[in-house]
Amino acid sequence: MTLSFFDQFLSPTLFGIPLIALALLLPWTLFPAPSSRWVNSRLLTLQSWFINRFTQQLLLPLNMGGHKWGPYILLVMVFLISINMLGLLPYTFTPTTQLSVNMALAVPVWLMTVIIGLRKNPTAALGHLLPEGTPVPLIPALILIETISLFIRPLALGVRLTANLTAGHLLIQLIATAAFVLLPLMPTVAILTTILLFLLTLLEVAVAMIQAYVFVLLLSLYLQENV
């Protein structure tokens, strides 16, 4: 059977049962639970340091009213980083390469920020649709443009995450296939291709973390507009 490069993005099944829910829940089993010991393990200490550092970075754009949403934003970021990193392992499925999964994350969070703004300060929330000092003839066009821009935000969040991870996985598979094919024909070129594959994998590790950070950073900026 001939396999396509895009087969890696198909949702895994077992006896016809989709396993995407299991893939989404797996990252949580990898995090050590807090213990009652006075001295934590190295893994738990590293996890605490990582979470504290990222919490400080994520709360910088938010005012005091938005700090109560910090744990939720941090939870989304850790969840995305875990899934993205696990997806780089061989023979694994990456749920965040599915637009449906990313939209399921982006739409409720975006809708939450809009509802918060409309409940707390509806005048300011609706005021974002019309910049101050707009000439009267341009008011209808600008309201339409800003409304479209508002509703495109969750789509941009989901598509950005999907496109970047999908492109990286395809490049890794293409270069790995080239190295495998070239190995018996041109070993020297195959070795150079393997080195390139290793460097690209390191780049993908950075992309996996950066895309998760960008997702929650944009989310925090949207939240800042409405709190």
From Swiss-Prot:
Keywords: ATP synthesis, CF(0), Hydrogen ion transport, Ion transport, Membrane, Mitochondrion, Mitochondrion inner membrane, Transmembrane, Transmembrane helix, Transport. One of its GO terms (biological process) is proton motive force-driven ATP synthesis. The chain crosses the membrane at residues 14-34, 69-89, 98-118, 132-152, 180-200, 202-222. It catalyses: H(+)(in) = H(+)(out). It comes from the Eukaryota. It is a multi-pass membrane protein. Its main location: mitochondrion. Disulfide bonds: none annotated. GO terms for cellular component: mitochondrial inner membrane; proton-transporting ATP synthase complex. InterPro entries: ATP_synth_F0_asu (IPR000568), ATP_synth_F0_asu_AS (IPR023011), ATP_synth_F0_asu_bact/mt (IPR045083), F0_ATP_A_sf (IPR035908). PROSITE patterns: ATPASE_A. One of its GO terms (molecular function) is proton-transporting ATP synthase activity, rotational mechanism. It holds the Pfam family ATP-synt_A. It is found in: Mitochondrion inner membrane. Subunit a, of the mitochondrial membrane ATP synthase complex (F(1)F(0) ATP synthase or Complex V) that produces ATP from ADP in the presence of a proton gradient across the membrane which is generated by electron transport complexes of the respiratory chain. ATP synthase complex consist of a soluble F(1) head domain - the catalytic core - and a membrane F(1) domain - the membrane proton channel. These two domains are linked by a central stalk rotating inside the F(1) region and a stationary peripheral stalk. Component of the ATP synthase complex composed at least of ATP5F1A/subunit alpha, ATP5F1B/subunit beta, ATP5MC1/subunit c (homooctomer), MT-ATP6/subunit a, MT-ATP8/subunit 8, ATP5ME/subunit e, ATP5MF/subunit f, ATP5MG/subunit g, ATP5MK/subunit k, ATP5MJ/subunit j, ATP5F1C/subunit gamma, ATP5F1D/subunit delta, ATP5F1E/subunit epsilon, ATP5PF/subunit F6, ATP5PB/subunit b, ATP5PD/subunit d, ATP5PO/subunit OSCP. Belongs to the ATPase A chain family. PANTHER family: ATP SYNTHASE SUBUNIT A. This is ATP synthase F(0) complex subunit a. The gene is mt-atp6.
